[in-house]
């Protein structure tokens, strides 16, 4: 009996055609040959490596291998098509292990779990980066880390066959071809060092990914000398270091192999003899501290002034926040407490405090907004010192419950940076169209740092994917509205652990 729970339509990784056996395109000889005679390829033909590599267009959840790779998010609960398919095929036990034992995964890291009902014995979870051209270098380094850490787990756990998915996703904005270069290059370098420990690495692609990988594969896994020569014309400028890691020129140590004088054949002995006749005074000319060139003093002064301005802004922000904090510790907030506008309600599955805001209880038009700011700070200041999440119930709220946009902007800039940094999710339950529009404008033009953390939920039960119902103190009118609009049991959480069934 197969302990992995074999099902129909499984594909044995060992039955897939190896890259070395696939047909090679008819490359036109000529300029490529002359180029290959002048330059050595950093990725030469290697029949042994090519016999370990597979490019397969298929469903990774059907692949019978020692392990498969799943691209997910930091909480190991991504709702992308691939991740959902993996969890659906594995069964609820996989999510239970992710929540109870793995406890999240940072971008660039990789963690391993059992495969449960999957044909693969293990699942290696990794979190790909979000791509932003402004932070391209960081994204490239993080994606490299995903593949490097994945292959490290392969070696540590003595995994001989693995199906590797495309870690970079269009959902996170990563250019597919750029991601393919990093993936293939990193695995190639790994196989060069540790190939004896691995039998098969299958790059599992779907749809448009297949075209991209078919184009890039020959660069890092050429099948003959003609393809190797052709690959030189397609080689990117950055081919990585000995591990495949992207090279950052600004961080390279520049060492001159020879002093300029020696490169021009100057006689060292003659130079030393001439130096011996110099007066001691001459030897020290220009070596005193006051004679050393120190750069453009005007430019340095401007830079110091700029840094000083930035520092002053930070100091001023902290001073303003401390003033509000002192007020928060002295005010009487009995009225706000009775209204239950803002309160902590248990923790989520990762142990992060859950802060609840009930919009209907906040009569913004008739409230001293200054006092409201102080109240919010009094409740949140100690909570936000660590990771936390916010649940905002928009249910039955009206215009009088919504503070002006100017107030939200001011509040955003008043609070300490820890509020933004440690906020991991902001769930808006029962949002209206207008609420979605206002949120989009606010997170786009004012609070861009939290935009990716906002999630709109049309029903309360969707919260149970992240928070146990026992940990939520939900107003009765919210539950009544939710039942009226959505009915009962309209959503089943991904595992019994999430619903408190275990």
UniProtKB/Swiss-Prot annotation:
Source superkingdom: Eukaryota
Domain Macro: 40-221
Domain CRAL-TRIO: 329-486
SS bond partners: none
Pfam families: CRAL_TRIO_2 (PF13716), Macro (PF01661)
Record PROSITE patterns: CRAL_TRIO, MACRO
Alphabetical list of InterPro entries matching this protein: CRAL-TRIO_dom, CRAL-TRIO_dom_sf, Macro_dom, Macro_dom-like, Macro_GDAP2
Gene3D superfamilies registered for this protein in UniProt: CRAL-TRIO lipid binding domain, Leucine Aminopeptidase, subunit E, domain 1
Family assignment from sequence similarity: Belongs to the GDAP2 family.
Identification of the protein by name: Protein GDAP2 homolog
Species for this entry: Nematostella vectensis (Starlet sea anemone)
Top-level taxonomy: Eukaryota, Metazoa, Cnidaria, Anthozoa, Hexacorallia
Gene it is expressed from: gdap2
